[in-house]
Each structure stands twice: as structure tokens, then as C-alpha cells.
Design a protein with these regions (language model features):
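Generic intrinsically disordered, low-complexity segments enriched for polar/acidic and small residues
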Residues: 18-19, 37, 70
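Short amphipathic alpha-helical segments, especially helix-boundary/capping motifs
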Residues: 12, 33, 47-51
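Beta-strand/loop substructures that line and gate deep hydrophobic ligand-binding cavities in soluble
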Residues: 41-95
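Alpha-helical structural elements
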Residues: 16-17, 35, 61
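Short, hydrophobic/aromatic-rich segments at coil-to-beta transitions
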Residues: 32-39, 58
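Terminal, regulation- and interaction-focused segments at domain boundaries
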Residues: 1-30
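Residue-level marker for the onset of beta-strands and adjacent loop->beta junctions
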Residues: 1, 34-36, 45-47
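Residues that act as N-cap/strand-start positions at coil-to-secondary-structure junctions
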Residues: 24, 32-34, 43
Length: 95
């Protein structure tokens, strides 16, 4: 299954969170890592994550056997953090 979500996190933050969520949290093996992409395998399936540096950042996920966990990850990164909104407002006022 393929999914796409937008986030206000940076691509680096998304990658770090994915490694923590899928690798450490779900014990999937990080099989490959490239510029803006990660590929995890385990439990008879896989998760592939690719980021595109846009505003907001676009994250594409492809999975087999890990759909519920991918949907949970998407919900976590899609939340807009209150401090990001605050910082954006401060930057606009200072400009």
C-alpha cells in the first residue's frame, strides 16, 4: 500500500523519527538508507519512506504488512507543533 502525508517537520527530523519509530520501536531492520529515503524490512514485510523537501515537507510511504503502524507514524508526523507556529509568527514579525 502507498501513502503520502505532509508535515512541517524537516526531512532530517522525519528520518530520525522514522528510525526511532520503525527501527527501535518496532525492531525492523534498516536495510538501506539514501538521501531522503529509508528502507526497513522485517516481520514478513517492509516499509519504504521517501521525503521531498518542500514547504510543507512531503513524505511518501510504501508498505507491506505494516499498514497500521505506518498510519500511526503518519498521524504523529502530520501534527503541527505549536512551537513551530509560534516561531513562524515571530520570524514574520521580525522580517
Amino acid at each position: 500500500m502507498r501513502y503520502e502525508v505532509q508535515t512541517y517537520m524537516s526531512p532530517q527530523e522525519v528520518m530520525e523519527m522514522a528510525i526511532s519509530f520503525f527501527g527501535v520501536g518496532l525492531d525492523l531492520e534498516l536495510q538501506s538508507q539514501g538521501f531522503g529515503s529509508l528502507h526497513f524490512v522485517g516481520g514478513g514485510g517492509h516499509v519504504t519512506l521517501t521525503t521531498r523537501d518542500e514547504d510543507p515537507v512531503s513524505v511518501e510511504l510504501e508498505t507491506r504488512e505494516w499498514d497500521a503502524q505506518v498510519e500511526e507514524f503518519m498521524a504523529r508526523i502530520a501534527r503541527r507543533r505549536w512551537w513551530r507556529r509560534l516561531w513562524k509568527g515571530v520570524k514574520e514579525e521580525l522580517a
